[in-house]
Amino acid sequence: MENVRREATRPSVPSGTLELYFPDHLYRNDYVSLEGPRWAPAIKQAVRWKFTPMGRDAAGQVWFTGLTNSEPGDAWYKLPRALDTPYREAHTRWHGCFQSRQRGLPPAYTQHLREMAFWDPAITAQYLNSGPRWGCMQWRDRQIRGKEFVVTRNQFGAKLPWRSDYVPLLSLPQRPRFTAQDFRQRGLQRPCPAIGQPPPAFTPAL
């Protein structure tokens, strides 16, 4: 708890308190801060890893974190039974941190905050099936169709240099023909980028 008080007095959250490197060491249950609309405090992930030989996949193991003391499947970020009882100490403390700020806001703003920040305390939950997760989202390493064109938009139609020193958006762009900007001939008619031919001449009808 000393770390929590020390981090709460700082004006900004240092990057060392955020969970940048996964997994953290096993015996740490300090509060951390997640970047979000309300900077909600959370607890380290409940899923730890068993001791496995190096080079093997670690099997997920559910550890008791004190968030729920009756039913392990009951998530701690759901509505508690009563805010004045220590049924869920972590959720009650998280809810009380921002209760004073919400009193000075109009009701529409407080409802908007609740709708936007419902995911703040959601960390790696106690799922029965195996699979890495980041927060409450399933981690997928496969590409999403359509997203790869955003990164390499300036290289459309050209061969990508699949070299070890190639970095997207940092290496020299491989632009297709007729797409390089020429400021000296900006006013002239440029050929069509798709077919590489000049546009048809405009003949006004008399």
Curated annotation (Swiss-Prot):
Listed InterPro entries: TKTI1 (IPR029203)
GO cellular component: axonemal A tubule inner sheath; axonemal microtubule; sperm flagellum
Keywords attached to this entry: Cell projection, Cilium, Cytoplasm, Cytoskeleton, Flagellum
Pfam families: TKTI1
Record bears the keyword Iron: no
Compartments, record wording: Cytoplasm, Cytoskeleton, Cilium axoneme; Cytoplasm, Cytoskeleton, Flagellum axoneme
Cytoplasm listed as a keyword: yes
GO-annotated biological processes: flagellated sperm motility
Main location (coarse class): cytoplasm
PANTHER family: HYPOTHETICAL PROTEIN LOC690617 (PTHR31254), TEKTIN BUNDLE-INTERACTING PROTEIN 1 (PTHR31254:SF1)
Described function: Microtubule inner protein (MIP) part of the dynein-decorated doublet microtubules (DMTs) in cilia axoneme, which is required for motile cilia beating. Located at the center of the tektin bundle where may function to recruit tektins or stabilize the bundle.
Quaternary structure annotation from Swiss-Prot or TrEMBL: Microtubule inner protein component of sperm flagellar doublet microtubules.
Protein name according to UniProt: Tektin bundle-interacting protein 1
Natural source organism: Mus musculus (Mouse)
